[in-house]
């Protein structure tokens, strides 16, 4: 049996596409409204909160969820764990969508979006800006991911010569793909260092924020591979390739990274004499313990062999790790930020609908492309299974 990726086939306009389609339309209409009538027409952003849910969720959390391709690139190509190679293309596709939509969120969040091209014009570079590094590095990485994913398109179109030429330089492209997120994911942690005391002490750490951001990127990257793979398997009604053994192996890496993060998190609080704030009994201490417990759950569960080999517990553990890291990113960038001056922020329903629409776009585009392009490993060779999968 061939292990080469194959198009899933089946109907393009499936039930999930029909369900999420209206959300995409609403999202697009609201984006047009924002671009034409300004930020105030759809958002609650103000002078104290220059960025909100579009940055905290769509960018910081969204690109964290999109780190699956990057995390697997390190596992497969840097640490030579070739057994994970079947997981690379699905993860890379999700990463490409996640980062692209994260870039779009920046575009709609910036007040004078027509000035964005100045980021890339020599003479206008602000090389001391973390925002500059993040924006330019992300843009380059999106292009790198497009090149990494191009072989799937070339194979589908039968462009053998182009595929051969691309494969000759793929080693360099992969090296860039492994390097670039290491830079901008750590920089995303540096974004709030300049906010100083305006970020609650439980999350403000001038030395550790970049490292915490990088660690959560790796944790989210490996966890999303298990999460998305489990959903695909459920969507194919159990007829997809059996990748559970690979997921179980990934849990070892996730457990180590979670342990490192938690130890460093508490170590920093103890060293800076801030641990008492975690027991203050206020809103921020509750958010802190929610974050910690969400990360402790998979750390405990994944240490028990029986639970680790259970598909449902694998899924729940990956989901818990994702939510824990997402909570940390949301809190340090938005919830724990207090600019003073009486400023307050809460996302409007239009802001939330745009963010929900981004998720809907990614889901629908992912479903469409796995049906058209060789992304997933072959299904189990059974006519009934193929029929069931095509209806998914």
From Swiss-Prot:
Swiss-Prot/TrEMBL keywords: Cell inner membrane, Cell membrane, Electron transport, Heme, Iron, Membrane, Metal-binding, Transmembrane, Transmembrane helix, Transport
Residue ranges annotated as Periplasmic topological domain: 1-11, 56-58, 112-133, 190-207, 271-281, 355
GO biological process: anaerobic electron transport chain; anaerobic respiration
GO cellular component: [Ni-Fe] hydrogenase complex; plasma membrane
Residues in the Cytoplasmic compartment per record: 33-34, 80-90, 155-168, 229-249, 303-333, 377-392
Compartments reported by the entry: Cell inner membrane
Protein's membrane topology: Multi-pass membrane protein
Molecular function GO terms recorded: metal ion binding
Residues that span the membrane, as ranges: 12-32, 35-55, 59-79, 91-111, 134-154, 169-189, 208-228, 250-270, 282-302, 334-354, 356-376
Function noted in UniProt: Probable b-type cytochrome.
Family: Belongs to the NrfD family.
Name under which the protein is recorded: Probable Ni/Fe-hydrogenase 2 b-type cytochrome subunit
């Amino acid at each position: 049996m061939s292990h080469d990726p194959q198009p899933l086939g089946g109907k393009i306009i499936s039930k999930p596409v029909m369900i999420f389609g209206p959300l995409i339309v609403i999202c697009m209409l609201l984006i047009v409204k924002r671009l034409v009538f300004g930020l105030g027409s759809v958002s609650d952003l103000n002078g104290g909160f220059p960025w909100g849910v579009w940055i905290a969720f769509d960018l910081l959390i969204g690109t964290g969820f999109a780190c699956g391709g990057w995390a697997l690139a390190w596992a497969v190509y840097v640490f030579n764990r070739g057994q994970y190679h079947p997981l690379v293309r699905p993860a890379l596709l999700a990463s490409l969508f996640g980062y692209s939509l994260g870039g779009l969120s920046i575009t709609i969040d910036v007040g004078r979006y027509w000035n964005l091209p100045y980021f890339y014009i020599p003479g206008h570079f602000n090389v001391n800006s973390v925002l500059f590094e993040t924006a330019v590095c992300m843009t380059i990485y999106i292009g790198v991911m497009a090149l990494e994913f191009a072989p799937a398109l070339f194979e589908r179109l039968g462009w053998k010569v182009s595929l051969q030429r691309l494969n000759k330089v793929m080693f360099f492209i992969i090296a860039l793909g492994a390097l670039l997120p290491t830079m901008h994911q750590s920089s995303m942690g540096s974004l709030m260092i300049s906010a100083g005391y305006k970020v609650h002490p439980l999350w403000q750490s001038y030395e550790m924020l970049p490292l915490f951001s990088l660690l959560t990127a790796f944790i989210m990257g490996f966890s999303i591979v298990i999460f998305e793979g489990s959903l695909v398997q459920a969507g194919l009604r159990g007829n997809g390739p059996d990748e559970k053994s690979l997921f179980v192996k990934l849990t070892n890496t996730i457990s180590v990274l979670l342990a490192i993060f938690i130890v460093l998190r508490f170590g920093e609080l103890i060293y800076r004499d801030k641990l008492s704030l975690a027991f203050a009994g206020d809103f921020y201490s509750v958010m802190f313990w929610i974050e910690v417990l969400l990360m402790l759950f998979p750390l405990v569960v994944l240490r028990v062999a029986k639970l680790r080999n259970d598909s449902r517990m694998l899924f729940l553990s990956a989901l818990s790790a994702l939510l824990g890291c997402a909570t940390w990113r949301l809190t340090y960038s938005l919830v724990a930020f207090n600019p003073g001056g009486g400023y307050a922020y809460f996302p409007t329903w239009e802001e939330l609908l745009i963010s929900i629409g981004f998720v809907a776009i990614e889901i629908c585009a992912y479903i469409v492309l796995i049906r058209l392009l060789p992304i997933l490993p072959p299904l189990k060779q059974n006519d009934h299974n193929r029929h069931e999968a095509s209806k998914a």
